[in-house]
Amino acid sequence: MEHYLSLLIRSIFIENLALSFFLGMCTFLAVSKKVKTAMGLGIAVIVVQTVAVPANNLIYNYVLKDGVLVSGLDLSFLSFITFIGVIAALVQILEMALDKYFPALYNALGIFLPLITVNCAIFGGVSFMVQRDYNFVESVVYGVGSGAGWMLAIVAMAGIREKMKYSDVPQGLRGLGITFITAGLMALGFMSFSGISL
């Protein structure tokens, strides 16, 4: 149990996909203007990541891995396209569910919801799962943790950006300029966790 808790904490803080690996920055910067929208997208990323990482773990370990189906048959060269297909299918299911049950959130997320399909944070989480050779339970924990870490980063950024609306930001830095500086300072803050070994 301690190992899984350590993996969860590590994936949220120490190996944060947004602020340590800078994955998913396009949606991170575009949707972080309001906390409510950022929270909705963060929950969507958690759901997709929690399902995509273990689903791709099963597909990789029981279909694509070298010698799993037939001795001497290595289908691992299909892993990228398979992972993207699974992620795309999960995002489509999530999009239909949000459209039916949460139309306000669906409209608020707009074009950024389908962009989760090509969000490199989701694909990065799946790739790290394969690279680190996680088992199924570890992949579930890592999926939840990496999604929660990305959500923590985007909600914190949205909160800071909402407060900056009332700040006296120099003319040349308004908009994305100060947002990039803020993201860099947040990344420095999260870098302080890198010395912790769990």
UniProtKB/Swiss-Prot annotation:
Residue spans crossing the bilayer: 11-31, 39-59, 77-97, 110-130, 140-160, 176-196
Alphabetically ordered keywords of this record: Cell inner membrane, Cell membrane, Ion transport, Membrane, NAD, Sodium, Sodium transport, Translocase, Transmembrane, Transmembrane helix, Transport, Ubiquinone
A Pfam family hit: Rnf-Nqr
Membrane-protein topology: Multi-pass membrane protein
Cellular localization per UniProt: Cell inner membrane
Domain of life from the UniProt record: Bacteria
Biological processes, Gene Ontology terms: respiratory electron transport chain; sodium ion transport
Enzyme class: translocase
E.C. designation(s): 7.2.1.1
InterPro entries membership: NqrDE/RnfAE (IPR003667), NqrDE/RnfAE_oxidrdctase (IPR050133), NqrE (IPR010967)
Major site of localization recorded for this protein: membrane
GO annotations of cellular component type: Gram-negative-bacterium-type cell wall; plasma membrane
GO molecular function: oxidoreductase activity, acting on NAD(P)H, quinone or similar compound as acceptor
Reaction equations catalysed: a ubiquinone + n Na(+)(in) + NADH + H(+) = a ubiquinol + n Na(+)(out) + NAD(+)
UniProt keyword Protease, yes or no: no
Role this protein plays: NQR complex catalyzes the reduction of ubiquinone-1 to ubiquinol by two successive reactions, coupled with the transport of Na(+) ions from the cytoplasm to the periplasm. NqrA to NqrE are probably involved in the second step, the conversion of ubisemiquinone to ubiquinol.
Subunit relationships: Composed of six subunits; NqrA, NqrB, NqrC, NqrD, NqrE and NqrF.
HAMAP family associated with the record: NqrE (MF_00429)
Family under the similarity heading: Belongs to the NqrDE/RnfAE family.
Protein name (Swiss-Prot/TrEMBL): Na(+)-translocating NADH-quinone reductase subunit E
Provenance organism: Aeromonas salmonicida (strain A449)
